């Protein structure tokens, strides 16, 4: 998020996103490290929190892991819609959450597809709720 603020000269990330998108990109992701990520497209905004972890050993490589998971999901599905990008952010965030559990990317060599699916479900449970206004 600091890069977005520096590039746009705006402190508000919503304003920063508008300034940056006025420079050309139609879609913008602003990563907020341990606080999640924001996806901007047109008038739509999606926020994905980071998974709350008790132990964060080392954030080295987490941003690259997030990007790799995001792009891999888009490449695998060949669906570049806003809705699928929301899913891609969750996939990237899930993979990044593994990365911080050990030094560098070591933890990524220890996980399998079932671990990834379970972590993604943790994200779904974190943000999925029903609300009924009274």
Over which residues does each language-model region extend?
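A generic structural signal for short hydrophobic patches within well-formed alpha-helices
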Residues: 2-5, 116
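Conserved phosphate-binding/catalytic region of the ribokinase-like
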Residues: 9-134
């Amino acid at each position: 998020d600091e890069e977005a603020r520096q590039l746009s000269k705006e402190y508000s990330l919503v304003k920063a996103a508008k300034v940056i998108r006025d420079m050309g990109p139609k879609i913008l992701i602003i990563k907020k490290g341990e606080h999640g990520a924001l996806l901007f497209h047109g008038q739509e905004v999606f926020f994905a929190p980071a998974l709350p972890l008790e132990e964060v050993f080392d954030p080295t490589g987490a941003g690259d892991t997030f990007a790799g998971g995001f792009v891999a999901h888009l490449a695998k599905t060949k669906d570049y819609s806003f809705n699928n990008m929301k899913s891609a952010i969750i996939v990237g965030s899930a993979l990044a959450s593994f990365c911080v559990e050990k030094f560098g990317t070591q933890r990524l060599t220890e996980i399998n597809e079932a671990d990834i699916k379970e972590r993604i479900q943790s994200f779904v449970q974190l943000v999925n709720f029903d609300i009924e206004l009274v």
